[in-house]
């Protein structure tokens, strides 16, 4: 406890002790941000404002200094519990209403007893030293990334999404640096210290703390204008061909803003929209109002990008822009509902990109984007509901995953079909108007949408949103009828209401049948319009609008493969690819048959979305069910050298690179890398050559050091050079060096740039190192709680995926089993992350 500049310490200590007892009894100041504390503050605190100052030295070895003036109103005398995840020595001083007062730094909070606060307006001033973790400091720049509960690591605050506040910011930075934040720059002054500038920013609109943001550093700025609106793009790129993409990026931001303004009927609700494109950024993007962050990996495309890469960038921009309305303007009340912002961002992103790509089958693209990713977690023993319980924001990052990002848009599309497009739009507009600059819940949205339909949306939501998993759906022809049955594989007796479409083919007869699975029935029967004669081929979910495991047998799969090869219906083929792959993963069809059929299908597929799906599924099959690589190498190299579509050649080359094992294949790749001469009509990028260098260093240990040194000398961009220097030791031919890299990754400070750390861990656990790297599994799993505590929201999943994805051995499975046996009470949400990524071992 700090009792600076206070008279009567003995009397005071008694008062504070008494107050502390009251606080402990209330159970409010536990570590993290508990739900009880959040509700308490929301009930008693209001009109919160932050006036923040940070002095940022040029060297990241020097500490940043911060000050915050926090003003608020209290409706009665209550303890003031301010979130700050720091140590006692990081808090330099605290004053309340202009006077020094006693305070306590404990359990990740600064606590001021109720004796010292006033009813009505209070003003707290705190001088502090922020932790570097969420400041993401590099040598020449830094950026804040505070979602979901990391604002409290950077400054003292009320770090909960429903305490929306106004922020004013001042930064003191080196004069050669640029700075950008949520608000526009109002003033830039030089300071009394040479080479330093003081930059002041305009007060923001009401924001949740996780949306507060600033970026400072050596950045290049571009400006673009359309219809009276300006957008600044900040970046660190040095490649002129990549910088030349900035106008196209700005155009897509403008397009997304205009689309949402038209759909919602609400003009862009914030003062500005700036884009900051950063190397090594942890996510695809982050929707900070006025200062939206993007990763350079997805924004600056290679010279000859694939359709997938172009769609990915457009979808990312549309996703983050949609968040301005869904997440920023209207924000979830608590992070158990974080999916309500992600569902809208992804659902609307799929619609916003449609007019940008008129030649793309967007129904197919929707299926391809969301359903496989959702199944990848929903089929596992680590599956979770879309909406999950959350009692403390310290665990909020574990709520994130493919279920909330990818299953939720599929469910939202079902909801739109139930409501109808016009009613859905009316309901969304009412939702945004009702909760403008405020907070909402899924239940609140459902109450609004219920006005526009006679369907029981609450009952529908209970199964699709509040329960985990998916139905197992089978179909057969019996006595001239199509019989479709659903089963809850988890034995809960759940019934998922949904509309499906089947096609039954018997010889020359064919019929398309709508199937309605009701919430009160496990089966559906319909008489066929023709008399079945012999074996029938039953095609499930032909429009891809259903969700579940559409179970087939090995014998039934031959009919699906035949239709896949012969059909011209792109959506049907996409749905069949998913069905066949899911049956591979559920082990109802054989890997050998899957490989052979896929290799026969791929050379003849001209649709780029279907080709990339099939190639990805083939790659997964080869990874999970290893086999002799030589015939596969030959088949893939034939695609690389003969396919008429250049991007198909490039995608096939990347899979060829990952599976190459034979001496001939490795030597071919080495010559290609050494001479920098790509196969005809298969243009390779710098990142392709970097990936080749890692792969060749592992295959050719006697040449590894020279390969790495040569590749490093070829890289010109300073940020990419630093990335390569960090990752390349993970492919060392010397086990002692690799062990040293692994040991270093167990230290939080060495995981600061999370994409680099993930890549290094993946290299350490490459399939070529599988026997040696089994030893890494237990210690890396033991580190998961610390990885979660010190990492950002997607990092625990990235960590365990990098650790386990290349392992297929019995020994690896035994390591995972032994870990769970040793930790029977391991946190459920963290356990699920492991189980999701380990499912292929079982």
Predicted regions and their residues:
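Bacterial Sec-dependent N-terminal signal peptides
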Residues: 1-29
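N-terminal, polar/Ser/Thr-rich
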Residues: 18-65, 92, 136-141, 159-161, ...
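Extended, low-hydrophobicity, Ser/Thr/Pro/Gly-biased non-transmembrane segments
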Residues: 32, 125-223, 461, 546-550, ...
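Ligand-binding face of N-terminal immunoglobulin V-set domains in extracellular IgSF glycoproteins
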Residues: 65-86
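A surface-exposed beta-strand-loop module
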Residues: 85-142, 194, 521-534
